[in-house]
Regions:
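Terminal alpha-helical segments
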Residues: 1-94
Protein backbone atom coordinates (compact mmCIF):
# COMPACT_ATOMS: atom_id res chain seq x y z
CA UNK A 1 0.00 0.00 0.00
CA UNK A 2 2.82 2.45 0.73
CA UNK A 3 4.22 2.27 -2.78
CA UNK A 4 0.79 2.75 -4.34
CA UNK A 5 0.08 5.76 -2.12
CA UNK A 6 3.41 7.37 -2.97
CA UNK A 7 2.80 6.80 -6.69
CA UNK A 8 -0.60 8.48 -6.47
CA UNK A 9 0.95 11.39 -4.58
CA UNK A 10 3.57 11.63 -7.33
CA UNK A 11 0.86 11.87 -9.99
CA UNK A 12 -1.02 14.51 -7.99
CA UNK A 13 2.15 16.58 -7.55
CA UNK A 14 2.94 16.28 -11.27
CA UNK A 15 -0.55 17.50 -12.16
CA UNK A 16 0.24 20.68 -10.21
CA UNK A 17 3.74 20.98 -11.77
CA UNK A 18 5.43 20.29 -8.42
CA UNK A 19 8.07 18.08 -9.96
CA UNK A 20 10.54 18.02 -7.07
CA UNK A 21 7.80 16.57 -4.87
CA UNK A 22 6.70 14.24 -7.67
CA UNK A 23 10.24 12.87 -8.01
CA UNK A 24 10.53 12.48 -4.24
CA UNK A 25 7.28 10.50 -4.06
CA UNK A 26 8.33 8.41 -7.06
CA UNK A 27 11.55 7.45 -5.25
CA UNK A 28 9.61 6.59 -2.09
CA UNK A 29 7.35 4.35 -4.18
CA UNK A 30 10.41 2.72 -5.71
CA UNK A 31 12.02 2.04 -2.31
CA UNK A 32 8.81 0.55 -0.91
CA UNK A 33 8.39 -1.59 -4.00
CA UNK A 34 11.97 -2.85 -3.75
CA UNK A 35 11.34 -3.93 -0.16
CA UNK A 36 8.20 -5.83 -1.17
CA UNK A 37 9.99 -7.38 -4.15
CA UNK A 38 12.81 -8.60 -1.90
CA UNK A 39 10.29 -10.36 0.33
CA UNK A 40 8.57 -11.86 -2.70
CA UNK A 41 11.93 -13.12 -4.01
CA UNK A 42 12.69 -14.75 -0.65
CA UNK A 43 9.33 -16.55 -0.76
CA UNK A 44 9.92 -17.72 -4.33
CA UNK A 45 13.41 -18.98 -3.46
CA UNK A 46 12.01 -20.89 -0.47
CA UNK A 47 9.40 -22.48 -2.71
CA UNK A 48 12.08 -23.36 -5.27
CA UNK A 49 14.04 -25.13 -2.51
CA UNK A 50 10.98 -27.26 -1.89
CA UNK A 51 9.96 -25.61 1.35
CA UNK A 52 6.28 -26.10 2.02
CA UNK A 53 4.28 -22.94 1.76
CA UNK A 54 0.58 -22.43 2.24
CA UNK A 55 -0.98 -20.56 -0.65
CA UNK A 56 -4.04 -18.78 0.61
CA UNK A 57 -6.12 -15.80 -0.43
CA UNK A 58 -3.83 -13.48 1.55
CA UNK A 59 -0.81 -14.52 -0.54
CA UNK A 60 -2.80 -14.00 -3.74
CA UNK A 61 -3.92 -10.60 -2.48
CA UNK A 62 -0.33 -9.63 -1.65
CA UNK A 63 0.84 -10.64 -5.14
CA UNK A 64 -1.97 -8.59 -6.67
CA UNK A 65 -0.91 -5.54 -4.66
CA UNK A 66 2.72 -5.99 -5.69
CA UNK A 67 1.76 -6.18 -9.35
CA UNK A 68 -0.51 -3.13 -9.13
CA UNK A 69 2.10 -1.13 -7.20
CA UNK A 70 4.71 -1.91 -9.83
CA UNK A 71 2.41 -0.82 -12.64
CA UNK A 72 1.28 2.32 -10.83
CA UNK A 73 4.88 3.35 -10.17
CA UNK A 74 5.67 3.17 -13.89
CA UNK A 75 2.47 5.05 -14.75
CA UNK A 76 3.41 7.79 -12.27
CA UNK A 77 6.74 8.22 -14.08
CA UNK A 78 4.91 8.57 -17.40
CA UNK A 79 2.55 11.17 -15.93
CA UNK A 80 5.55 13.09 -14.62
CA UNK A 81 7.07 13.14 -18.11
CA UNK A 82 3.77 14.13 -19.74
CA UNK A 83 3.10 16.98 -17.31
CA UNK A 84 6.66 18.25 -17.76
CA UNK A 85 6.09 18.35 -21.52
CA UNK A 86 2.74 20.10 -21.06
CA UNK A 87 4.36 22.69 -18.82
CA UNK A 88 7.13 23.26 -21.37
CA UNK A 89 4.62 23.64 -24.22
CA UNK A 90 2.57 26.11 -22.21
CA UNK A 91 5.72 27.97 -21.21
CA UNK A 92 4.59 27.96 -17.61
CA UNK A 93 6.84 28.05 -14.61
CA UNK A 94 5.55 27.37 -11.12
Amino acid sequence: GNSESASIMSIEASREYRFDEAHQQYHIADEELRTAHTIQTQLLQAAARGESMEMDILMVHAQDHLTMASLLKEVSKEFMNIYQEIQALKGEKR
